[in-house]
């Protein structure tokens, strides 16, 4: 850049992020009626609009190309940064009641009403543990009926290696070309339309919905343009105020196992969390849930179902699945697979493909196509086993207490009889990492003792850069650079393990992989867990090595 020349795109991005931070932290903006009565605020926004119209702070990204990389760059600009997330947490305001109203408005601006999404014949899935796996199972079952349902959409989060994984058709991520095409169709429609600031004070000219909301809009647009006959939607967080809850008439809803997670948004108790999850229930759409839910949570789910004038049915593990090798490993997946069977059954019966619904009984007879769908389900990063050279990698992106216990138990059972060296590769940057490590340790001990334990950041490359699809602004960059979390984890591990394992800290996933390759000449079993960011980054590192 020439000396003295201003970097307008960076200035603009900085201005917009700071403006957003002001809005998020200002009480008046959470209450539109207060905004209407404040002349100073109204004048400020009129002036801001004037600046936008002069192209001084107009979105700079509309002037760049429209490749897949451009789309990813534009999408990453919509992430909330760490400071904003912390500010929202500190306010203690868990209910942004404008969220769904804004989703309806964003939809209008790209040419849709919520009723347009009804044609997608949606399965809507929430829960704390296993909702992504259940969504994948359901999609795979429906995919066995290609003659009647030639295109099945699947919307899940987060992604592992590529953001395209979030929007799938017939189980495969949409192509880079289609992602870019549909992305910029949505982006440009938002640029060419405006909203009433009286009704939507957050939606200033040139602004966009946040990262997840934008992807939700993009998924609807993609699935409609691709003429999908049925779609499976996984909730992002919670349910009641999740952006996917713009879905007005799902065919069926599912709730996987409940647990404590995302407490700053959903509440600190299982009752509060269940209330949020039950927010996806709709009149006329039957709801199903797994057995052995926490009793307090199940009570709330039943109350929510009654309130929404629908039914809630507990699904037992089907005996017919006991000897079936599911496409996603782990004994606990039998419950998710059973739930998926009931969800798919509702869709297929409603579509006049199945004459009779499958009975919700442990002794029910499950059609062969359902079994094939469950066996063929592919879902990377969940109880995944990879052989790389002399080593065997056991990979699971567990990041909650319950999922960590399940994943650690799976690893313990898989390697209990193995005589190989045992290595743990762990990362968790934003949750209570030490508590997760304690859950892991208690689940594998005393049967499994690790020889080496490596704590890494979620940075992909040793150059300090991330794979473009894995850029995350949701963690403290200072903590990442100073390895604060990793050093804390080392102290905690040495304490609970009585200094038996050798502990290591790496600044990137690539360095962690290189370290593992040099630790031993003999084979090793490596357990990779703690976050999906770690799992995704490691798979990207593997891909680069395979290409070489």
UniProtKB/Swiss-Prot annotation:
ATP binds at residues 130-133, 382, 396. It is found in: Mitochondrion; Mitochondrion inner membrane; Mitochondrion matrix; Cytoplasm. Its main location: mitochondrion. Pathway: Cofactor biosynthesis; tetrahydrofolylpolyglutamate biosynthesis. It is an enzyme of class 6 (ligase). NCBIfam families: folC. This is Folylpolyglutamate synthase. The gene is MET7.
């Amino acid at each position: 850049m020439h000396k003295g020349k201003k970097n307008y795109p960076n200035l603009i991005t900085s201005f917009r992020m700071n403006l957003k931070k002001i809005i998020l932290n200002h009480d008046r903006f959470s209450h539109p009626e207060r905004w209407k009565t404040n002349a100073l605020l109204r004048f400020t926004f009129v002036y801001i609009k004037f600046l936008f119209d002069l192209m001084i702070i107009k979105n700079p990204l509309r002037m760049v190309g429209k490749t897949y990389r451009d789309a990813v760059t534009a999408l990453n600009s919509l992430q909330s940064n760490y400071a904003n997330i912390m500010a929202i947490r500190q306010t203690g305001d868990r209910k942004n009641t404008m969220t769904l109203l804004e989703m309806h408005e964003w939809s209008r601006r790209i040419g849709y009403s919520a009723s347009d999404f009804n044609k997608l014949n949606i399965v809507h899935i929430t829960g704390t543990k296993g909702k992504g796996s259940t969504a994948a199972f359901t999609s795979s079952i429906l995919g066995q009926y290609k003659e009647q349902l030639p295109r099945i959409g699947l919307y899940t989060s987060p992604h592992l290696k590529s953001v395209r994984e979030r929007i799938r058709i017939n189980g495969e991520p949409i192509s880079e070309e289609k992602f870019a095409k549909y992305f910029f169709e949505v982006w440009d429609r938002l640029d060419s339309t405006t909203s009433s600031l009286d009704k939507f004070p957050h939606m200033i000219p040139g602004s966009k919905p946040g990262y997840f909301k934008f992807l939700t809009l993009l998924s609807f647009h993609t699935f409609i343009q691709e003429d999908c006959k049925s779609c499976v939607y996984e909730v992002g967080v919670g349910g009641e105020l999740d952006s996917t809850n713009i879905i007005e008439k799902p065919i069926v809803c599912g709730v996987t196992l409940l647990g404590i997670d995302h407490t700053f948004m959903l509440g600190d108790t299982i009752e509060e969390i269940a209330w949020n999850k039950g927010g996806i229930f709709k009149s006329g759409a039957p709801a199903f849930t797994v057995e052995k839910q926490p009793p307090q949570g199940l009570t709330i789910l039943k109350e929510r179902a009654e309130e929404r004038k629908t039914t809630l049915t507990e699904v037992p593990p089907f005996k017919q699945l006991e000897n079936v090798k599911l496409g996603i490993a782990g004994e606990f997946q039998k419950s998710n697979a059973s739930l998926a069977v009931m969800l798919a059954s509702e869709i297929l019966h409603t579509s006049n493909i199945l004459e009779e619904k499958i009975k919700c009984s442990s002794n029910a007879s499950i059609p062969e196509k359902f079994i094939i769908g469950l066996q063929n389900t592919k879902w990377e990063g969940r109880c995944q086993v990879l052989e790389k050279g002399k080593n065997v990698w056991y990979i699971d992106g567990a990041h909650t207490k319950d999922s960590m216990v399940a994943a650690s138990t799976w690893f313990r059972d898989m390697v209990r009889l193995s005589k190989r060296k045992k290595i743990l590769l762990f990362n968790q940057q934003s949750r209570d990492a030490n508590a997760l490590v304690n859950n892991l340790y208690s689940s594998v001990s005393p049967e499994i003792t690790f020889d080496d334990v490596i704590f890494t950041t979620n940075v992909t490359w040793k150059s300090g850069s991330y794979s473009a699809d894995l850029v995350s602004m949701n963690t403290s960059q200072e903590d990442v650079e100073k390895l604060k979390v990793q050093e804390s984890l080392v102290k905690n591990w040495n304490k609970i393990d009585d200094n038996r394992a050798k502990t290591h800290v790496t600044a990137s996933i690539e360095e962690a992989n290189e370290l593992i390759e040099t630790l031993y000449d003999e084979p090793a079993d490596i357990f990779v867990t703690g976050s999906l960011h770690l799992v995704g980054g490691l798979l990207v590192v593997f891909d680069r090595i395979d290409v070489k």
